[in-house]
UniProtKB/Swiss-Prot annotation:
Reactions performed catalytically: uridine(2552) in 23S rRNA + S-adenosyl-L-methionine = 2'-O-methyluridine(2552) in 23S rRNA + S-adenosyl-L-homocysteine + H(+)
Function: Specifically methylates the uridine in position 2552 of 23S rRNA at the 2'-O position of the ribose in the fully assembled 50S ribosomal subunit.
Lineage: Bacteria, Pseudomonadati, Pseudomonadota, Alphaproteobacteria, Rickettsiales
Organism superkingdom: Bacteria
Xref: Pfam families: FtsJ
Protein name: Ribosomal RNA large subunit methyltransferase E
Entry-linked Gene3D superfamilies: Vaccinia Virus protein VP39
Amino acid sequence: MSSTRWLHRQLNDPYVSLAKKQGYRSRATFKLIEMDSKFSIFKKGQYVLDLGSSPGGWSQFAAQRVSHNNNNPVFAVDIQNMDAIPNVIFIQCDIINDIELLSDKFHNKKFDVILSDMAPKACGNKQVDHANIINLCEISLDIVVRFTRENGVFITKILQGEYEKEFYQSMKTYFQSVKYFKPKASRKDSSEMYLVGLGFKKDSQDIKTIES
């Protein structure tokens, strides 16, 4: 997309204006707000992990929803830097290569909600872009299995394509229910959707250990 077309789209996007008005760092925040309204994701006192967090819109909203007496209830992880957010601990690392670093930073903590709005840089080839985001989804699911509490929730971005159903079935192994959701805040011309895993099965951690 040319810079002129991008600027025109941004200026005419109601969610961009709304994000600025409400103090959120990105329009993507409203996708999470919709999913929380639909599935009742967040509760006070929960711990949340936000993968691919920069610039921080999802972490902002999650911290607002769960902050109670638990200081720093949200852990945010991204390969890029992210400006500080109240009640959010930011870890700058590459989740593909630094999972043991994450384990050290989490101090054996388990999360009630794990979020992933990650997407690789688009190359313009839909099949390649789809395969790349599925790879990120699989890496995120590995983290979910390792660090999620029983009955926890996992939300991940996905692009429709060849491997979509296979990944959906993988999620069903670990969650009592898996739902597709396309927020109104998603652009109409985008193939992005979200998978929402509800009710993480504690026993599924044993399945993953055996497979490994």
